[in-house]
Amino acid sequence: MFKAQGFNVQYGSDICADRLNSIGDYILITHIEPWQFLKGKVKNQPLEVIEAKDLSKKYLDNLANRVPAVHIVGLGGGSAMDTAKWVHWRRQLPLTQIPSIPSVDACFTRMSALREEGGVKYEGDAVPELVIVDYELFRSAPAPMITSGIGDILSCHTAWFDWKYAHEQGRDEFGWKPSDPEISKTYLKELADCAPGIKAQTDDGLKRLMELHRDVGWRCHE
Protein backbone atom coordinates (compact mmCIF):
# COMPACT_ATOMS: atom_id res chain seq x y z
CA MET A 1 0.00 0.00 0.00
CA PHE A 2 1.19 3.53 -0.82
CA LYS A 3 2.68 5.34 2.19
CA ALA A 4 2.85 9.13 2.08
CA GLN A 5 5.14 11.48 3.96
CA GLY A 6 4.36 15.08 4.82
CA PHE A 7 2.54 17.44 7.18
CA ASN A 8 0.39 16.30 10.10
CA VAL A 9 -3.08 15.55 8.78
CA GLN A 10 -6.41 14.48 10.24
CA TYR A 11 -9.00 12.69 8.11
CA GLY A 12 -12.69 12.29 8.86
CA SER A 13 -16.26 13.46 8.27
CA ASP A 14 -17.68 16.60 9.89
CA ILE A 15 -14.47 17.25 11.83
CA CYS A 16 -13.84 20.91 10.92
CA ALA A 17 -16.03 22.42 13.63
CA ASP A 18 -14.29 20.48 16.39
CA ARG A 19 -10.95 21.94 15.35
CA LEU A 20 -12.24 25.50 15.01
CA ASN A 21 -14.02 25.29 18.36
CA SER A 22 -10.81 24.24 20.10
CA ILE A 23 -8.15 26.69 18.88
CA GLY A 24 -9.19 29.91 20.62
CA ASP A 25 -9.15 33.22 18.77
CA TYR A 26 -8.46 32.94 15.06
CA ILE A 27 -8.58 34.76 11.74
CA LEU A 28 -10.26 32.88 8.89
CA ILE A 29 -8.90 33.25 5.36
CA THR A 30 -11.43 31.65 3.05
CA HIS A 31 -13.76 31.63 0.07
CA ILE A 32 -17.48 32.30 0.45
CA GLU A 33 -18.80 28.83 -0.43
CA PRO A 34 -16.95 26.61 2.09
CA TRP A 35 -17.54 29.06 4.92
CA GLN A 36 -21.26 29.13 4.14
CA PHE A 37 -21.23 25.35 4.43
CA LEU A 38 -19.41 25.35 7.79
CA LYS A 39 -20.46 28.57 9.51
CA GLY A 40 -23.61 27.25 11.16
CA LYS A 41 -21.71 24.30 12.65
CA VAL A 42 -19.03 26.42 14.35
CA LYS A 43 -19.59 27.86 17.83
CA ASN A 44 -16.22 29.61 18.01
CA GLN A 45 -16.64 32.19 15.25
CA PRO A 46 -13.52 33.90 13.81
CA LEU A 47 -12.44 37.37 14.87
CA GLU A 48 -12.40 38.30 11.20
CA VAL A 49 -13.26 36.61 7.91
CA ILE A 50 -10.92 37.54 5.06
CA GLU A 51 -11.77 36.51 1.51
CA ALA A 52 -8.75 35.18 -0.39
CA LYS A 53 -8.51 37.16 -3.60
CA ASP A 54 -5.14 38.82 -4.21
CA LEU A 55 -1.85 36.92 -4.25
CA SER A 56 0.45 39.84 -4.95
CA LYS A 57 3.33 40.19 -2.51
CA LYS A 58 2.39 43.78 -1.62
CA TYR A 59 -1.18 42.85 -0.71
CA LEU A 60 -0.15 39.79 1.27
CA ASP A 61 2.50 41.69 3.23
CA ASN A 62 0.01 44.43 4.09
CA LEU A 63 -2.48 41.79 5.20
CA ALA A 64 0.10 40.00 7.33
CA ASN A 65 1.11 43.25 9.01
CA ARG A 66 -2.43 44.23 10.02
CA VAL A 67 -3.96 41.03 11.40
CA PRO A 68 -3.86 40.37 15.16
CA ALA A 69 -1.46 37.80 16.59
CA VAL A 70 -3.87 34.86 16.74
CA HIS A 71 -4.27 31.47 15.08
CA ILE A 72 -4.51 31.62 11.27
CA VAL A 73 -6.95 29.29 9.52
CA GLY A 74 -7.00 28.74 5.78
CA LEU A 75 -10.29 27.35 4.44
CA GLY A 76 -10.87 26.87 0.73
CA GLY A 77 -8.90 26.22 -2.42
CA GLY A 78 -5.35 27.02 -3.41
CA SER A 79 -5.53 30.80 -3.05
CA ALA A 80 -6.90 30.54 0.50
CA MET A 81 -4.16 28.05 1.40
CA ASP A 82 -1.45 30.28 -0.09
CA THR A 83 -2.75 33.43 1.60
CA ALA A 84 -2.93 31.71 4.98
CA LYS A 85 0.57 30.30 4.53
CA TRP A 86 1.98 33.75 3.81
CA VAL A 87 0.39 35.41 6.84
CA HIS A 88 1.50 32.54 9.08
CA TRP A 89 5.06 32.66 7.75
CA ARG A 90 5.46 36.43 7.88
CA ARG A 91 4.10 36.67 11.42
CA GLN A 92 5.15 33.26 12.76
CA LEU A 93 1.60 32.55 13.92
CA PRO A 94 0.03 29.10 14.38
CA LEU A 95 -1.63 27.75 11.24
CA THR A 96 -4.40 25.26 10.49
CA GLN A 97 -5.21 24.45 6.87
CA ILE A 98 -8.63 23.14 5.81
CA PRO A 99 -8.81 22.47 2.07
CA SER A 100 -12.37 22.54 0.77
CA ILE A 101 -11.57 20.68 -2.46
CA PRO A 102 -8.92 18.08 -3.33
CA SER A 103 -7.98 19.79 -6.58
CA VAL A 104 -4.41 20.89 -5.70
CA ASP A 105 -1.66 20.16 -3.19
CA ALA A 106 -1.37 23.72 -1.81
CA CYS A 107 -2.30 22.69 1.73
CA PHE A 108 0.71 20.35 1.79
CA THR A 109 3.38 22.65 0.32
CA ARG A 110 5.49 25.15 2.22
CA MET A 111 5.70 27.97 -0.34
CA SER A 112 2.97 30.37 -1.47
CA ALA A 113 2.35 30.83 -5.19
CA LEU A 114 2.61 34.61 -5.52
CA ARG A 115 1.29 36.39 -8.61
CA GLU A 116 4.01 38.82 -9.65
CA GLU A 117 4.98 40.45 -12.95
CA GLY A 118 2.46 38.46 -14.95
CA GLY A 119 3.65 35.11 -13.62
CA VAL A 120 3.94 32.88 -10.57
CA LYS A 121 6.76 33.05 -8.02
CA TYR A 122 7.07 30.58 -5.16
CA GLU A 123 8.21 32.06 -1.85
CA GLY A 124 7.80 31.48 1.87
CA ASP A 125 8.25 28.58 4.27
CA ALA A 126 5.02 27.59 6.01
CA VAL A 127 4.43 24.51 8.16
CA PRO A 128 0.90 24.14 9.59
CA GLU A 129 0.15 22.58 12.94
CA LEU A 130 -2.46 20.45 11.22
CA VAL A 131 -4.20 19.90 7.90
CA ILE A 132 -7.87 18.94 8.28
CA VAL A 133 -9.35 16.82 5.48
CA ASP A 134 -13.13 16.67 5.90
CA TYR A 135 -14.88 14.35 3.47
CA GLU A 136 -18.28 16.00 3.91
CA LEU A 137 -16.77 19.38 3.13
CA PHE A 138 -15.25 17.93 -0.04
CA ARG A 139 -18.55 16.38 -1.07
CA SER A 140 -20.27 19.77 -0.77
CA ALA A 141 -18.23 20.98 -3.77
CA PRO A 142 -19.16 20.45 -7.43
CA ALA A 143 -18.00 17.04 -8.67
CA PRO A 144 -15.58 18.41 -11.32
CA MET A 145 -13.70 20.30 -8.60
CA ILE A 146 -13.18 16.99 -6.80
CA THR A 147 -12.13 14.80 -9.71
CA SER A 148 -9.85 17.52 -11.10
CA GLY A 149 -7.50 16.71 -8.25
CA ILE A 150 -5.97 13.96 -10.36
CA GLY A 151 -4.42 16.67 -12.56
CA ASP A 152 -1.77 17.68 -10.04
CA ILE A 153 -0.74 14.03 -9.68
CA LEU A 154 -0.64 13.41 -13.43
CA SER A 155 1.54 16.49 -13.86
CA CYS A 156 4.19 14.84 -11.68
CA HIS A 157 4.56 12.28 -14.45
CA THR A 158 4.23 14.47 -17.53
CA ALA A 159 6.77 16.98 -16.17
CA TRP A 160 9.52 14.36 -16.31
CA PHE A 161 9.44 14.52 -20.09
CA ASP A 162 10.08 18.28 -19.98
CA TRP A 163 12.97 17.75 -17.57
CA LYS A 164 14.46 14.98 -19.72
CA TYR A 165 14.17 17.17 -22.81
CA ALA A 166 15.91 20.05 -21.00
CA HIS A 167 18.70 17.64 -20.00
CA GLU A 168 19.12 16.47 -23.59
CA GLN A 169 19.32 20.10 -24.73
CA GLY A 170 22.01 20.94 -22.17
CA ARG A 171 19.69 23.17 -20.14
CA ASP A 172 19.19 20.99 -17.06
CA GLU A 173 20.02 22.86 -13.85
CA PHE A 174 19.03 20.08 -11.45
CA GLY A 175 20.75 16.90 -12.61
CA TRP A 176 18.36 14.59 -14.47
CA LYS A 177 18.83 10.85 -13.83
CA PRO A 178 16.95 8.02 -15.58
CA SER A 179 15.89 6.67 -12.18
CA ASP A 180 14.18 9.92 -11.16
CA PRO A 181 10.76 9.21 -12.74
CA GLU A 182 10.24 6.03 -10.69
CA ILE A 183 8.27 7.85 -7.98
CA SER A 184 5.85 9.20 -10.58
CA LYS A 185 5.17 5.64 -11.71
CA THR A 186 4.28 4.80 -8.12
CA TYR A 187 1.90 7.78 -8.09
CA LEU A 188 0.28 6.65 -11.34
CA LYS A 189 -0.29 3.13 -10.03
CA GLU A 190 -1.87 4.41 -6.82
CA LEU A 191 -3.99 6.90 -8.77
CA ALA A 192 -5.25 4.16 -11.09
CA ASP A 193 -6.15 2.02 -8.08
CA CYS A 194 -8.09 4.73 -6.28
CA ALA A 195 -9.66 6.45 -9.34
CA PRO A 196 -13.04 4.68 -8.99
CA GLY A 197 -13.24 5.83 -5.37
CA ILE A 198 -12.38 9.40 -6.34
CA LYS A 199 -15.16 9.39 -8.94
CA ALA A 200 -17.62 7.94 -6.42
CA GLN A 201 -16.37 10.35 -3.72
CA THR A 202 -15.86 7.59 -1.18
CA ASP A 203 -13.94 8.31 2.01
CA ASP A 204 -11.21 5.90 0.89
CA GLY A 205 -10.89 7.43 -2.57
CA LEU A 206 -10.70 10.98 -1.24
CA LYS A 207 -8.17 10.04 1.43
CA ARG A 208 -5.90 8.28 -1.04
CA LEU A 209 -6.00 11.25 -3.41
CA MET A 210 -5.05 13.59 -0.59
CA GLU A 211 -2.27 11.25 0.53
CA LEU A 212 -0.84 11.53 -2.98
CA HIS A 213 -1.01 15.32 -2.72
CA ARG A 214 0.63 15.09 0.70
CA ASP A 215 3.59 13.12 -0.60
CA VAL A 216 4.01 15.39 -3.62
CA GLY A 217 4.03 18.41 -1.31
CA TRP A 218 6.68 16.81 0.88
CA ARG A 219 8.89 15.98 -2.11
CA CYS A 220 8.71 19.58 -3.31
CA HIS A 221 10.90 20.47 -0.33
CA GLU A 222 13.23 17.49 0.00
Task: Please place each PLM-identified region on the residue numbering.
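DPxDG-like acidic metal-binding loop motif
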Residues: 75, 82-93
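Residue-level detector of flexible, active-site-proximal loop/helix-junction positions
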Residues: 54-56, 79, 102
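Short glycine/serine/threonine-rich phosphate/pyrophosphate-binding segments
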Residues: 35-37, 79-86, 104-107
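Alpha-helical scaffold segments in soluble metabolic enzymes
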Residues: 18, 22, 62, 86, ...
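Glycine-rich beta-strand-to-loop/alpha-helix junction loops that act as flexible
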Residues: 31, 75-77, 214
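A glycine/threonine-rich phosphate-anchoring loop and its flanking beta-alpha core
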Residues: 89-187
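Active-site segments that bind and position negatively charged phosphate/pyrophosphate groups
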Residues: 176-222
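ATP/NTP phosphate-donor binding region
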Residues: 1-71
